[in-house]
């Protein structure tokens, strides 16, 4: 997407949505095949940039209905496509419960994003129903989310100096590292900090506040993404601090022998797993219902 002075963020996203839907049409998907589409990534974190020097991609998760062939052969589409303004991940809607069960934040954030496309009112009500289970999902599977976020931070550490395809010039420009990876690690650390503190102070994890950045922390992370830090050594030290912090926050929710724990689940000193499946089962039932109605 090229930069055009005067366009609002919402206008950029609307333009990207049109391009994404056009790309879906080009690979054979009609409006009635779509369950819902949702923006994923920096747009949801309030860390997207639309300036002369830097224009953020608008990435999407797209969930579609299976066709009869998929049902008969037990196939579930899962592919990633590039389009004019970024990329979109195409997923069979039947995959949604298991993706959420893993508590990968890149899917959990879809339950909070305001940037949503549904082809009709029926699908909008379906998404509203799914989103209605998000707080229950957090309470039932918080340790899994913390472990997943720690894993994401470790991935950013491994990628900090790695010359992925198309990044060689960028890494050379910044003296041997990719500042975007550092930016992501800091964002993950902030999210884990917010989740941990809100849970231990109120008994409820505040995912939304940790997801959407504002004020000085937002300015700092955008500055690092665009301009980097003073040196490779400074970047590595800051990354190590992020990994250490994420590991510490994760340790509040996992024992040394890898058992999930939460302070509100201790009963007379006996171990009780805090991981519950009630919300996932409700989401699975909702998905089963809309898919069944599709073929009724």
Question: Model-predicted segments: where are they?
Answer:
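N-terminal regions immediately upstream of nucleotidyltransferase
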Residues: 1-21, 29, 262, 296
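Aromatic-acidic/polar surface patches that form glycan- and anion
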Residues: 9-13, 89, 174-181
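Hydrophobic, Leu/Ile/Phe/Ala-enriched alpha-helical segments that form helix-helix packing faces
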Residues: 16-28, 100, 246-249, 253
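Active-site nucleotide-donor binding segment shared across nucleotidyl transfer reactions
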Residues: 19-75
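A structural signal for short, well-ordered beta-strand segments and their strand-loop junctions
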Residues: 36-39, 109-110, 194-197
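Extracellular structured ligand-interaction cores
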Residues: 55, 59, 97, 132, ...
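A basic- and aromatic-enriched beta-loop-alpha substructure that forms the phosphate/nucleotide-
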Residues: 71-162
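Conserved nucleotidyltransferase catalytic core and NTase-mimicking acidic/glycine-rich helix/loop elements
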Residues: 122-293
